[in-house]
Each structure stands twice: as C-alpha cells, then as structure tokens.
C-alpha cells in the first residue's frame, strides 16, 4: 500500500488533537482502574457508565469534524474504546454496535474520498472497500486492525463465520481460494504494532486476536463434544487450554476434556482433568456434575452420590460480586451451553432432583425421601401455578416430582407421609380434571389442553393404593387401585413425538400400558391377600392381555390358576405365552415413579417358578 501525502496540520487543530488524545488516555486509565476498584458493584457500574459517556462525547466531537487522515487514528481508537467498554458493560454485542462499526469504516472512506454519496454498503462491502484501497495510510493500520478484531468478535458471537473467514483472509492478504480453516487464519493473523506515541486503547488487536483464537477453539471443542466427534473435540479443547483461557473458561475446558475422555472409555483419565478443573477454584459445580457421571460409569455409587451432594452445596452457595471487566474476554464469545450438553450444569433444584432420583434408583430410599421432601419445599412455596402442564424438556415437571417423592416415601416405609404428598397433589390437580361424567366425550379435546393430568391423577391413586397396602388397609387400597384403573381406561395415548420429555414419557402408549398393568397386578395382589382368588385371576388375566409377554403378570396368573387347581388352563396359558416373543424391556422409557412401582410387584422368584412350571408342563406332555 502506498502512503499518501498528509498536509501539515494547523497549529490549533494539532493542539486540539493533543487535548483529545489526553482526554482519551485519561478515560482509558479510568476504565482500567475500575478493575481494581473495591467499591460495591453498583457504584463501579455507575463509574464505568460515566467513563463510557465521556468516551461517547469525545467520539461525537471527533466525528463532528470533516473526516481527515491525521485525526483518524485517534478517532478509530476512541471508537474501539467505546465498543469495548460498552460490550463489557452489557456483557453482550448488541445490534447497535454494528452501526458504530459501519460509521467508523465510512469515515475512513470519506477521509480518502472513496465513499460514494448516499452509499448503502453493508459491513462486508465496507470492509472490502477499506482494506482493498491502494492509498490506505500505514498509520491507520493499527487502529483499523483493532476495529477489524472487534468486527471479528461480533461476527463470531453471532455465528457469521463465513463473513469472519472472508475478513481474516483479507487481513492476511489471502485470496478467496486460500485456507478456510478459521483456527489457522486466526493464528496467521499478525496485527501491526502501534507506533509510539499512540493514544491508549483498552484492548489492542493482538489481545483481541488471542481472545478470538481461544474462543473459537472452545466453541469448536464444545460443539464436537455434543455431536460425538470426540478426537476433534479433544484436539480443539487442548488448543483452548493452551491459549488465553481465563479461569472460568478453563474450568469448562477441563470439564469438557473429562466428558470427552469418559465418552471415549477412559474414566480414570477423565478424573484427572476434573481434578484439575476443581483446582482452578472459580466454580466447582460443573466438574462435580461430570465427576458424578464418571463415577456412575465406574460403578462407584458412593462417590457418585457424594459428588451430587457436593454439587447441590456448590449451587446453593452465594457468590460474591465479580470484579468489573473493562475488557472483552473469552466468556463473552461462548454461547450458553445447550441443555443437552455435558457442560449444562442446571440449577440447584435440578441438581437436588438428580441426587434424589439417583438415591431412589440405587436403593437408598431413606436418603431419597429426605431429598425429595427438601426439593418440594424448595420448589412449591405455596404456588399452584407450577402445577400447570410442563413446557420445557429440562427434567420432570412438578407433579412428576411429587409422584417420585411419594414412591420414595413408600419405598422408605413412610406410607403416611406418602399419602400426605399424594393428597396435596390431588388437591392441586383436581381442578384441572374434567368431570368424570364428561371425561370420555371430552378426552381428546382435554388431552390437548392438559395431556398429562389424567395420568398424574391415575398414578397418584396407584401410589395411594400402595401406601394403604403397606399400612394393611385392604379396603382403602382396593378403592384407590380401582379409581386408578377407572381413569386409566379412559385415557388415550398421545403422539410420543409431541411435547416435553416429561409429557412424552407419561403419555406414551408403553407408559400407559405399564401403568395399567401395575394397577391391575397391585389390585390383584390385594384380592389374593383377602382370599378372593377369582377376582385376582380376572385382574391378572387382564394384565397379560394388555401386555402380552409380561412375565410378572404371567407369574401371578399361573400361581393363581395353580391355587385354584385349574392346571389345564395354566398349562394352556403357559404354552401360548411361551410361543410369544418376550416383551421388550421398557426401563428408561418410563417415568421413574412408574419404574419404582413396577419394582414392587416384581416377584423375586419369578424366573425360577416359570422355568419349573414350564418343565412340568413339558414332562406332562411327554407322559
């Protein structure tokens, strides 16, 4: 690029430039001082806002003059300082920042008389016009590269990666056909150094380039972790860890590396990275959550639950206000983790639920019951609006939490407490149910409005029946199981692809069938306990008709037929059942409360009995 002759400055203008530069330098020092300010957050924020206003006023003064090359380095530097401080204050890149960038580029073209009147060029076109100008003065390059780095930051944060690639190719002097590897382009970019004396800048182009480099490596690594490109994710995450990585981001990177190694089948190495993440010390929630997953993979239940307990504590701790950031840092360029990402930590209540559910699943019913009660106390707070149908897929909805809590209480032998939870749930959901007389006619219409409500109420009656059964109150248990079945046989399955994860599990055809089977077998067992085998037989037979191949139902049906001395019917049923394909395991696709209910009716000697019965049938056939 050839330099152009710069006319001598009038003495008064030169003096004004010196004053304006001093003003810029003073404001920059003021902004940097705020990072060491120990005053309360609101006062620091106000001071930063005042500094930004000072920079904006200075910028308006400079932009109010005719565009001139001698003043442009200062003007562009002030513009960069405004953008950096503004983005730091709001911790985001708002759309109006593009107007500032556009105005800065237009001023560069105006100074060189290259801007056409009433030009409507976009940012891409303006950058091309500025950077391809043959007469671009060298003294403008440092400030222009800083402005370009802010443009790069904006485009990365808004996922305009093609525009960013083209800009970097132009800055590197590359042709369009050259490398499109953003990581390589960022490494190749070497912003020119400022010549002394130059106006102070909050963050120069080289610093911003390093931020971009680390942020892009993080973004790529995190995304590849989600999509399953684990070797590429590992490579990018190592790149990020070796770069300009602030502590909060380093925790995420080490945790992501741990998740990557866990998925690659290296849990022990994963723990090493998670230990490093904990040593960084800014936040321990994320590595603790990942550690619980690693310990679960290793089968170390005690360590898994301990990690989850520490996670709940970590998320409940109050954090002191962070120091003010007057710079653009890597965090600003990282999107919020997707709920499906291993880097999504969630809230304290979500962590508490995870702990409670894992306690229930691993046989620690007493602990599970206490955790569920704590969780419900935390979430409910007297608000009935939380019992509306779920709208997100982030874990179970409140009614399902109540059902899980009741199941945990029954499992822990606390039937009366379980009844209390169930009564509370019924009180809060009864107003959402249509009247029984009109339920059948309105089933389809109501299913669209309140798709899970009939299932919630049915499951509540099932759990109440189990609680009464534990208390040896057969009459009440039979009544609850019957109410459950009456409602269930009026409930229609829904499209499993619609709604949240909570809705899909509770409304699926498989879930409804299993819920009916659980209620029928539970009622049948109460009939058996009261000596009414004929009524029990009817329920057991209906359960295997609903779910052909269900081995629990088959066990109870065969036992009852045997007790009633109906051996021929039992043999015929066994032969028919034996010819059917085994029922697929529905575990994992069912709500946790239902899995727990099904575990209660699962006879421990089922397989031995069925095998022995089958052998006797075959022997009788031979004879």
UniProtKB/Swiss-Prot annotation:
PROSITE patterns: TPR_REGION (PS50293). InterPro entries: FANCG (IPR039684), TPR-like_helical_dom_sf (IPR011990), TPR_rpt (IPR019734). Keywords: DNA damage, DNA repair, Nucleus, Repeat, TPR repeat. It is found in: Nucleus. Its main location: nucleus. Highest expression levels in spleen, thymus and testis. Coiled coil: none annotated. GO terms for cellular component: chromatin; Fanconi anaemia nuclear complex; mitochondrion; nuclear speck. GO terms for biological process: DNA damage response; interstrand cross-link repair; mitochondrion organization; ovarian follicle development; response to radiation; spermatid development. The keyword Protease does not apply. TPR repeats lie at residues 251-284, 349-382, 458-491, 517-550. It comes from the Eukaryota. Transmembrane segments: none annotated. PANTHER family: FANCONI ANEMIA GROUP G PROTEIN, FANCONI ANEMIA GROUP G PROTEIN FAMILY MEMBER. DNA repair protein that may operate in a postreplication repair or a cell cycle checkpoint function. May be implicated in interstrand DNA cross-link repair and in the maintenance of normal chromosome stability. Candidate tumor suppressor gene. Belongs to the multisubunit FA complex composed of FANCA, FANCB, FANCC, FANCE, FANCF, FANCG, FANCL/PHF9 and FANCM. In complex with FANCF, FANCA and FANCL, but not with FANCC, nor FANCE, interacts with HES1; this interaction may be essential for the stability and nuclear localization of FA core complex proteins. The complex with FANCC and FANCG may also include EIF2AK2 and HSP70. This is Fanconi anemia group G protein homolog. It comes from Mus musculus. The gene is Fancg.
């Amino acid at each position: 690029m050839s330099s152009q002759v710069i006319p001598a400055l009038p003495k008064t203008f030169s003096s004004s430039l010196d004053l304006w530069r001093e003003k810029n330098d003073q404001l920059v020092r003021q902004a940097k001082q705020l990072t060491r300010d120990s005053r309360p957050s609101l006062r620091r924020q106000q001071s930063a806002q005042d500094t930004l206003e000072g920079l904006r006023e200075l910028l308006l003064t400079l932009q109010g003059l005719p565009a001139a090359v001698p003043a442009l380095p200062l003007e562009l530097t002030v513009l960069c300082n405004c953008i950096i401080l503004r983005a730091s204050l709001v911790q985001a890149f708002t759309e109006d920042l593009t107007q500032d960038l556009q105005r800065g580029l237009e001023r560069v073209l105006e100074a060189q008389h290259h801007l056409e009147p009433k030009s409507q060029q976009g940012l891409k076109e303006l950058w091309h016009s500025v950077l391809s100008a043959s007469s671009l003065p060298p003294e403008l390059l440092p400030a222009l590269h800083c402005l370009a780095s802010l443009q790069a930051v904006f485009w990365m944060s808004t996922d305009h990666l093609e525009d960013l690639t083209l800009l970097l190719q132009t800055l590197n002097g590359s042709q369009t056909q050259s490398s499109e590897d953003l990581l390589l382009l960022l490494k190749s970019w070497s912003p020119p150094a400022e010549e002394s004396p130059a106006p102070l800048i909050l963050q120069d182009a080289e610093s911003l380039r390093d931020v971009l480099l680390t942020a892009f490596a993080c973004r790529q690594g995190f995304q590849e972790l989600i999509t399953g490109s684990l070797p590429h994710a590992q490579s990018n995450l190592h790149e990020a860890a070796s770069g300009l990585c602030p502590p909060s981001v380093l925790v995420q990177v080490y945790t992501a590396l741990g998740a990557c190694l866990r998925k690659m089948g290296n849990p022990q190495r994963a723990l090493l990275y998670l230990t490093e993440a904990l040593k960084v010390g800014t936040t321990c929630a994320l590595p603790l959550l990942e550690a619980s997953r690693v310990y679960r993979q290793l089968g170390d239940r005690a360590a898994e639950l301990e990690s989850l307990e520490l996670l709940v504590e970590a998320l409940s701790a109050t954090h002191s206000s962070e120091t003010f950031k007057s710079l653009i840092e890597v965090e600003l360029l990282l999107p919020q983790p997707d709920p499906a990402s291993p880097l999504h930590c969630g809230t304290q209540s979500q962590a508490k639920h995870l702990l409670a559910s894992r306690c229930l699943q691993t046989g620690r019913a007493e602990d599970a019951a206490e955790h569920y009660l704590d969780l419900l106390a935390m979430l409910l707070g007297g608000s009935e609006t939380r019992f509306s149908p779920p709208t997100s897929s982030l874990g179970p909805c409140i009614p399902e939490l109540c059902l899980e809590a009741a199941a945990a209480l029954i499992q822990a032998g606390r039937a009366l407490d379980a009844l209390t939870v169930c009564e509370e749930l019924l009180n809060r959901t009864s107003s959402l149910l249509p009247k029984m007389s009109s339920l059948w006619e309105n089933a389809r219409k109501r299913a669209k409005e309140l798709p899970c409500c009939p299932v919630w109420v049915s499951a509540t009656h099932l759990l109440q029946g189990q609680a009464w059964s534990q208390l040896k109150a057969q009459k009440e248990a039979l009544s609850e199981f019957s109410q459950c079945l009456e409602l269930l046989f009026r409930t229609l399955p829904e499209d499993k692809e619609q709604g949240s994860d909570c809705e899909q599990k509770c409304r699926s055809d498989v879930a409804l069938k299993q819920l009916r089977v659980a209620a029928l077998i539970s009622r049948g067992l109460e009939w058996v306990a009261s000596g009414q085998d004929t009524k029990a037989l009817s329920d057991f037979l209906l359960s295997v008709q609903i779910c052909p191949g269900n081995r629990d139902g088959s066990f109870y049906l065969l036992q009852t037929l045997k007790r009633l001395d109906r051996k021929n019917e039992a043999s015929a049923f066994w032969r028919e059942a034996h010819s059917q394909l085994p029922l697929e395991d529905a575990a994992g696709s069912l709500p946790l409360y239902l899995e727990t209910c099904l575990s209660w009716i699962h006879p421990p000697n089922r397989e031995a009995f069925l095998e022995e019965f089958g052998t006797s049938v075959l022997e009788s056939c031979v004879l």
